[in-house]
Structure formats: C-alpha cells, structure tokens
Amino acid sequence: AYKRFSELLPAGEKENARSVRLPKSRILTLPELRANPFQHRICRVFSTSEDRDDSMSFEDFLDMLSVFSDSATSEIKSCYAFRIFDFDEDGTLDKKDLENLVNCLTGQSEESRLSSAEMEQLIQNILEESDIDKDGTINLSEFQHVISRSPDFARYCPPVW
C-alpha cells in the first residue's frame, strides 16, 4: 500500500510520503477508480482533508484499500457503501440520493438515462423493498438489512475493484 501511494505522488514529494497528501487528480489515476462511476464519492468519503479537496493522506489511502480488500467484513463494506451512496451526506438515502445512485450506475448519456417515470418507479420499488419504517428514506440499519440478504454484496460492493 505504501509503495502504491508513494508511486502516485509527484516526483519531488516521494521522500515525504508519510506527511504529504495525495491530490484527488492522482488518486483518480488508479486503474481501480479510473472507470468507477463512484470515483468522486469514494475520494470524498475516504478523504480527511480539512480543505474538502478530497486529497488523501497515506492513512486515508490505507483505509480505502482496507475497506475494498477481500478481508474486510460485510458490515464494514456496507457502512462505507452507505456513505458513498449518501450523496448529500445527511445520514439517510432519500429519493435524491437514490436518483444520483441510479444515474451513476446507468450513465448520464441520453440513451442510457431512465425516463422520469422509470426513475420514479425504480425509486418507489427500492423504497418499498428497503424502507422498513416507511419514512421515505433508507437509514444505515435498513440498508444493512437489505444487504444482509445479498450474498454477493461483500464481493462486489462498494463497486470498486
């Protein structure tokens, strides 16, 4: 992990890898993130930058690699997946978060974008399946409950590598 982190640093900063922050633009060059539809959210969630520039320290980078490793538990993966999918960072997945999630998965082009009616129906179906307390949002425990019924979740989510 340290070798991968330091290889992404600009040439003059490699010797200070433990104390320097890796710019988001460099993080996004990782093959695992390059084509990932959630690449910007992943950087946001794992970055501890006070400037909110989504840069990462070595510790942030290590946290990201740990969560996406095969040895991370489903509970840890689901917590981070929830945070990645919570676009407005309010602690719940509401209709807008779900719409953003669907748009990330289907793409933004005209031919792949869902119609308004299709999007509304899909979000309604997701909420019917997941919103146990019927408050119109999905909280972390509801998300984890749905995930617990998906045996492939730990292998494929968060959808990174």
Language-model features and meaning:
Residues 90, 133-135:
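Acidic carboxylate motifs that coordinate Ca2+ or other divalent cations, activating on Asp/Glu
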Residues 4-10, 17-39, 43, 56-70, ...:
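Amphipathic regulatory helices of Ca2+-sensor modules
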Residues 8, 48-49, 83-87, 128-130:
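Calcium-binding motifs, dominated by EF-hand helix-loop-helix domains
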Residues 117-123:
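Mid-core helix/loop region of P-loop NTP-binding domains shared across ATPases and GTPases
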Residues 25-28, 123-127:
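Amphipathic alpha-helical segments that form the core helices of the histone-fold
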Residues 72-76:
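Short pre-active-site segment immediately N-terminal to the catalytic Zn-binding motif
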